[in-house]
């Protein structure tokens, strides 16, 4: 069995020159200072000590370099060797990423567990990120010798799994005339499948490419995002929508359901592929994802059921893993997401949680003796967050054929004590366009998703108006009315506490009842039931339409009844006479989308018509 430790010798390889080494001068937790590093570059990858620990240079002063080590540094000694690799921290991109689980620096955890037989990652482990021996079905596109290719051109397709086609692209920095292209067949990641000639120099390419994680992958141009990210959560899709290529933040205290929302997005959103980064969260949560996702299925347009895991990549960096690797895990995840974006896919990246990432920055900053800013975080916290979120967006991809792709970033934030004035939360909110604020009080009342509809917002509502107009021309007005009802309820609550509900006007009683319908039977959603774990957008629209239709009809009936000589129409009378319709309004959420869109829309339309006729009959009876 091959060793996971690589060449753990007391000295490095004989082929290395002594000038390639530096020597450890100081060790402080994950931070190591090495001398004799003249000529090294910022963010260069190095191997530290006799165990070949992976590290990255984060500061250069003269010939000394400060290195953050991505593994446990216990046992390192002064004068241990530091080997330069002359390349930045990079990820391997190619077939085999989907369905895999990596740590923060893209080491495959399943392979390491199999080879080492241990539940923990051994120090200095050296395992390639992608399996180089697996054979993949390679199908070149209609290209031949003599054709010209430039960076980003798609030249072949690989069958990755029954859910995803993997398009093989030329690296962004390559170009030339084709001198060889492999015929269709099965190849491994070590086999040459393409050869290009440029200015008399020939270069071979495999299906694998590497890319430095801190460098955004180039695009042809950025585009305005105008397609909604449909999550299957009514409160998000209807009231606070995001777009494919948007940036979202989910701040909330512990136990508010951030992880459940992130996982629901991974399971049910209309993205083509999902990169889920567990950054500094509990190991049990990642274990839950690993157990749940392979069992979850999604129904494709042709009726096939496929495992959600086939479109998911997991980057697990749990809270007991080295702190420095948390920072790398975010960049590893976004680089993998950009790779799939460049194929023309819509990618969602979940970062759970960016607060842990910021804490890693704070710890490293403290070790470097940098001047602390608010709450001890480094002064460059906002700049780092911005550079990460800026990698989201809808783009026109580099190369041909012409295609658009997008990366949507959803970042969970865990402010201590649920305090939204925390530096990480406030810096995040100044960058992102969608704010899904979770409320501890709602969570304690078992109202999930616990998104507070009074403080949350989305800046994409205007960009999505054309989509809503095509989908349903009434929806924007209905949504505005629903928001007004919820806001009005908040205003009335203070009056109710002072004088009681009976003292209110009839229209205000109707407002409170409608708001209760919206809160308990529309915004609340049970993620663990077959009928409510995912709500298609047409169901969200029709449910809201019927609730607001009831609100409008009830108000009209009360106003008309006030001017008549007969029996006055009151809220109590409406509730008594139309109790069965009211029950059907409450029961809308129990309609199962598995019955099909036509069946459900038929039921919702019938309820809409029955509401109209029910109120008409009530008015006729009371005249």
UniProtKB/Swiss-Prot annotation:
Residues the record lists as binding ATP: 252-259
Any one of the GO CC terms: plant-type vacuole
Gene Ontology biological process: ATP metabolic process
The protein's name: V-type proton ATPase catalytic subunit A
Keywords tagged on the record: ATP-binding, Hydrogen ion transport, Ion transport, Nucleotide-binding, Translocase, Transport
Secretion signal span: none
Catalytic activity: ATP + H2O + 4 H(+)(in) = ADP + phosphate + 5 H(+)(out)
Subunit details: V-ATPase is a heteromultimeric enzyme composed of a peripheral catalytic V1 complex (main components: subunits A, B, C, D, E, and F) attached to an integral membrane V0 proton pore complex (main component: the proteolipid protein).
Keyword ATP-binding: yes
Gene Ontology MF terms: ATP binding; ATP hydrolysis activity; proton-transporting ATPase activity, rotational mechanism
Domain of life: Eukaryota
Record bears the keyword ATP-binding: yes
HAMAP family referenced in this protein's UniProt entry, alphabetically: ATP_synth_A_arch (MF_00309)
Species per Swiss-Prot/TrEMBL record: Daucus carota (Wild carrot)
Free-text function comment from the UniProt entry: Catalytic subunit of the peripheral V1 complex of vacuolar ATPase. V-ATPase vacuolar ATPase is responsible for acidifying a variety of intracellular compartments in eukaryotic cells.
Family: Belongs to the ATPase alpha/beta chains family.
EC number: 7.1.2.2
């Amino acid at each position: 069995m091959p060793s996971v430790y690589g060449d753990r010798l007391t000295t490095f390889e004989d082929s290395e020159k002594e000038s390639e080494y530096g020597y450890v001068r100081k060790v402080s937790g994950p931070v190591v200072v090495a001398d004799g590093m003249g000529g090294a570059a910022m963010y260069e990858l190095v191997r530290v000590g006799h165990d070949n620990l992976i590290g990255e240079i984060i500061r250069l002063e003269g010939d000394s370099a400060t290195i953050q080590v991505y593994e446990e540094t216990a046992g390192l000694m002064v004068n241990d060797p530091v080997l330069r690799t002359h390349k930045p921290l990079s990820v391997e991109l190619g077939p085999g990423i989907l369905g895999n689980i990596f740590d923060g620096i893209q080491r495959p955890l399943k392979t390491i567990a199999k080879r080492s037989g241990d539940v923990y990652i051994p120090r200095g482990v050296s395992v390639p990120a992608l399996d180089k021996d697996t054979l993949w079905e390679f199908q070149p596109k209609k290209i031949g010798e003599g054709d010209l290719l430039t960076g980003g051109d798609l030249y072949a397709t690989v069958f990755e799994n029954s859910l995803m086609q993997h398009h093989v692209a030329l690296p962004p920095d390559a170009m030339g005339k084709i001198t060889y292209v492999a015929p269709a067949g099965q190849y491994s990641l070590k086999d040459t499948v393409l050869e290009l000639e440029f200015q008399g120099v020939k270069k071979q390419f495999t299906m694998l490419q590497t890319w430095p994680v801190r460098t955004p992958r180039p695009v042809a141009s950025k585009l305005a995002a105008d397609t909604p990210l449909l999550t299957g959560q009514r409160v998000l899709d209807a009231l606070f929508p995001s777009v494919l290529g948007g940036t979202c933040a989910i701040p909330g205290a512990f136990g508010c359901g951030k992880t459940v929302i992130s996982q629901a997005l991974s399971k049910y959103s209309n993205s083509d592929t999902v990169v889920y980064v567990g950054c500094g969260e509990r190991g049990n949560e990642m274990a839950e994802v690993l157990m749940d996702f392979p069992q979850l299925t999604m129904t494709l347009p042709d009726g096939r059921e496929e495992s959600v895991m086939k479109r998911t990549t997991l980057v697990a960096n749990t809270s007991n893993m080295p702190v420095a690797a948390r920072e790398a895990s975010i960049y590893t995840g976004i680089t993998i997401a950009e790779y799939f974006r460049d194929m023309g896919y819509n990618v969602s990246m979940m970062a759970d949680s960016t607060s842990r990432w910021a804490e890693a920055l704070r710890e490293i900053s403290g070790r470097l003796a940098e001047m602390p800013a608010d709450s001890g975080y480094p002064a460059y916290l906002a700049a780092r967050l911005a550079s990460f979120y800026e990698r989201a967006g809808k783009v026109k991809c580099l190369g041909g054929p012409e295609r658009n792709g997008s990366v949507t970033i959803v970042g969970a934030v865990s402010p201590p004590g649920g305090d939204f004035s925390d530096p990480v939360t406030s810096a995040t909110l100044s960058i992102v366009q969608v704010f899904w604020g979770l409320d501890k009080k709602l969570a304690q009342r078992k109202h999930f998703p616990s998104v507070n509809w009074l403080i949350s917002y989305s800046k994409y509502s205007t960009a999505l108006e054309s989509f809503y107009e095509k989908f349903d021309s009434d929806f924007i007005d209905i949504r505005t009315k629903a928001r007004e009802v919820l806001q009005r309820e908040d205003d009335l609550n203070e009056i109710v506490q002072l004088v009681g509900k009976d003292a209110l006007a009839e229209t205000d009683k109707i407002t409170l009842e409608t708001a209760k319908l919206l809160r308990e039977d529309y915004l609340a959603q049970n993620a663990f039931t077959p009928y409510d774990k995912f709500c298609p957008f047409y169901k969200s629209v029709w449910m809201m339409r019927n609730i607001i239709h009831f609100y409008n009809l009830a108000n009209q009936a009360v106003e008309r009844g006030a001017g008549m000589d007969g029996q006055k129409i009151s809220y109590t009378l409406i509730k008594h006479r139309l109790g069965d319709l009211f029950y059907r309004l409450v029961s809308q959420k129990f309609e199962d989308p598995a019955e099909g869109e036509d069946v459900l829309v038929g039921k919702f339309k019938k309820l809409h018509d029955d509401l109209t006729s029910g109120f008409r009959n009530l008015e006729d009876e009371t005249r």
